[in-house]
């Protein structure tokens, strides 16, 4: 249904290089330790509520970078996995050849999609849904990154407004109407909006045309 473009692998090569060698920023500085922050930690409370609602046990951390959500701790020294109530989190990071995709109750995808070439967004979204048994939880950055690709371009290659991402999610969710999805969009490091939890089946079951 969806085909990946040649740019997908080219970008993956760039991110693999950056993970190994670091990257330049747009302010002229150079960063050696890269993509090791556990982005879902900032959303611990939201994830905890969703896990409790679905009684979820497992999660796939899609685009996990260099972090491991099974061991990383919150500021109070409690493990993230214990706080949110999950039993096992499977990391998957193709830029580091880390982990394998595994169908889980929940799929987490935080600060990943903005790094994907625009043609390949539908393919990746479909991949997220196909690996979820209950819910897909996404945060996407809607602003330019400080990081630069090795070719000098901005590392956030697909920057679009929140409503655009909402439309993408709604379209792909028609293929998986029983899967819930939650969307967060960030327009800055401290400026995050929650666009709610949705499920296409609820719209199909409604007696209203206007949704």
Where are these regions (language model features)?
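Conserved N-terminal segment of class I S-adenosyl-L-methionine
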Residues: 1-106, 122-125, 131, 142, ...
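Residue-level micro-sites within transmembrane alpha helices that shape
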Residues: 60, 113-114
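Hydrophobic beta-strand segment of the Class I
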Residues: 107-108, 112
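A short His-aromatic
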Residues: 115-116, 120
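Short glycine-centered segments of the SAM/dcSAM-binding site in methyltransferase folds
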Residues: 134-137
């Amino acid at each position: 249904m969806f085909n990946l473009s040649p740019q997908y692998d080219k970008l993956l090569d760039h991110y693999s290089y950056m993970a190994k060698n670091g990257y330049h920023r747009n302010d002229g500085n150079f960063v050696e330790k890269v993509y090791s922050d556990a982005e879902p930690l900032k959303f611990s409370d939201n994830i905890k509520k969703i896990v409790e609602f679905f009684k979820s046990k497992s999660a796939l951390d899609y685009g996990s970078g260099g972090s491991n959500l099974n061991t990383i701790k919150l500021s109070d020294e409690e493990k993230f996995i214990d706080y949110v109530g999950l039993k096992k989190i499977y990391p998957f990071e193709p830029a580091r050849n880390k982990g394998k995709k595994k169908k889980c109750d929940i799929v987490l995808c935080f600060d990943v999609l903005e790094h994907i070439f625009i043609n390949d967004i539908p393919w990746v979204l479909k991949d997220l849904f196909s690996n979820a048994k209950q819910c897909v939880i996404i945060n996407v950055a809607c602003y330019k990154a400080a990081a630069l690709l090795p070719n000098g371009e901005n590392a956030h290659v697909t920057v679009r407004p929140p409503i655009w991402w909402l439309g993408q999610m709604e379209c792909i969710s028609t293929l998986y109407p029983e899967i819930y999805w939650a969307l967060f969009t960030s327009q800055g490091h401290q400026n995050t909006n929650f666009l709610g939890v949705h499920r296409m089946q609820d719209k199909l079951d409604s007696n209203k045309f206007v949704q």
